[in-house]
């Protein structure tokens, strides 16, 4: 069995607890469905947000989603000055590390913009 990475990203309409939780759960549900994942398959999840999101941790949404035993980590994306014109506001990103026998090519990433 190997560990594979699955990336996902979405944006949220506002910096509020409800918006962050709703957007994060929607993202995780899509990734879990597209990749046929159960919480036991997930070795860890690393969430990042753009610095304009501070109302809630995406990991708190993952706990509400049922990932109580999954190791989770949150952080902010680096504020690289040259990237500011290209960066998405209110963006939530996740890197899932999953235990699987499937090849990397079988993993399905997700990007969604509100």
Describe each region flagged by the PLM.
Residues 1-114:
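Terminal domain-initiation and capping elements
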């Amino acid at each position: 069995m190997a560990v594979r990475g699955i990336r996902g990203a979405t944006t949220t309409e506002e910096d509020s607890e409800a918006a962050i939780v709703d957007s994060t759960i929607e993202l995780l549900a899509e990734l879990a469905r597209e990749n046929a994942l159960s919480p036991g398959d997930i070795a860890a999840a690393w969430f990042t947000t753009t610095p304009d999101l501070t109302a809630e941790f995406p990991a708190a949404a993952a706990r509400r989603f049922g990932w109580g035993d999954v190791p989770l980590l949150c952080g902010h994306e680096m504020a690289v000055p040259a990237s500011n014109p290209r960066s998405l506001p209110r963006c939530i990103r996740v890197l899932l590390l999953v235990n699987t026998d499937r090849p990397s090519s079988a993993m399905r990433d997700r990007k969604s913009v509100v």
